[in-house]
Amino acid sequence: MGRLAIIVTFFALLGQSPTTFDLSTDFSLHDNPDKAWQFGYSETNSLASNQFRIDQHVDDLHPIGFWHPAVNNGPGPGYYPYVAFNSTQQTQYGSSNGWAARAGEVAMEASSAGQYSMVRFTAPVAGPYKVSARFAGIHFGLSTTDVHVMHNDSSLFDADIEGYGGDPAFHKVEGANPTAAYSGDINMKAGDTLTFAVGYGKNKTNFGDTTGLFAQVILIKNKQ
């Protein structure tokens, strides 16, 4: 086999190898959109794809930074819904020490008006993808939220979180449904979206609702 043929074969095989998009690894507190990921919220109390809005303000705090809809003065207008991230290698307390996020965990909370906190993935190319998501209540007051995984406007997964399912060194695991997980395979076109969303739950209040998320999307094989 000639050198050119070997090079062509190598890149063809490389293009067919799995590509992993890991939210914890890829998360940025500087760029939004961040490669294939966007951090945002719903304009209204709706999961419709056209309601997604990108967060415009970042509090690049340490150890946990926050994306917010707009510049704000703390809890109130512009603060909720938020998408936060623990960039360290160990569990850290969140705002007011009322919750804790594990290493690499994204923390999400809806607004009191029912706007969803959202993380969105946009497929860079067409192909089969493996999707996994793990949600957990991480507020010490026991989170009561609804969590979702959407493909464009179609629901892949819906569940309720009731309880605490985070780091047991910070609070005991308790509640009727402290965690929820999804795993599935899906074919996507380039530009298709996956949305991971957290709402304010059946009690329709976001008080004490911080919910953790780990998510991963793997492109199994590029369509040639």
Please tell me what each predicted stretch does.
Residues 4-13:
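Sec-dependent N-terminal signal peptides
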Residues 17-224:
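Gly-Asp-aromatic-enriched flexible segments
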